[in-house]
């Protein structure tokens, strides 16, 4: 039977002076995330903004937190350094509820980019509000290197040899680790945290990069397949 994987929504908020559909609150999914999950024959369900998260956690086999808007600094006890970095508190609250519900149901959770930051904040961690060297308009073409932590889960998946290339676009980054989290990878050469994993029961793992954007033709690139397979295997093993 195909696995049923929930994906948290990106939110588009109505803009002043907008017309038509842009006057509405929109829940949406970046299709590359769906394609990545569909490549392993999983069924993909975007979870709309709602108050029934426990029911979704009961019915679905796992959760992926997709990328998108900043985490509001208010979520980790800080004020935004700039007004435009206020983030999306509505989405923050909803995704924290999702992480809590799926974790309580012992369902695996995988965070991508913003999802890694959200998991860290949900567990009491903090963020660097601005990391300009990791922010770029190149979007899914921006590549930098990461080094996997020796002995980590990712090192067991991929081996520990040398820096590996990933697609990573963000201007926030994990600062202080949340509860029961360990570092799985760091950016090279600046050492920012790029991947985390829970040391507690169940599967809770997150990467700051975008595995769904990986280029299979890049010989030095980190193949997204093993990470996806590990997550889906955790969903099957429940």
Regions found by a protein language model. Give the residues of each.
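N-terminal beta1-alpha1 cap of cysteine-dependent amidohydrolase-like domains
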Residues: 1-108, 121, 128, 132-158, ...
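Gly/Ala-rich beta-loop-alpha elbow adjacent to hydrolase catalytic centers
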Residues: 111, 115, 120, 124
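Active-site-proximal beta-strand elements of phosphoester/diester hydrolases
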Residues: 205-208
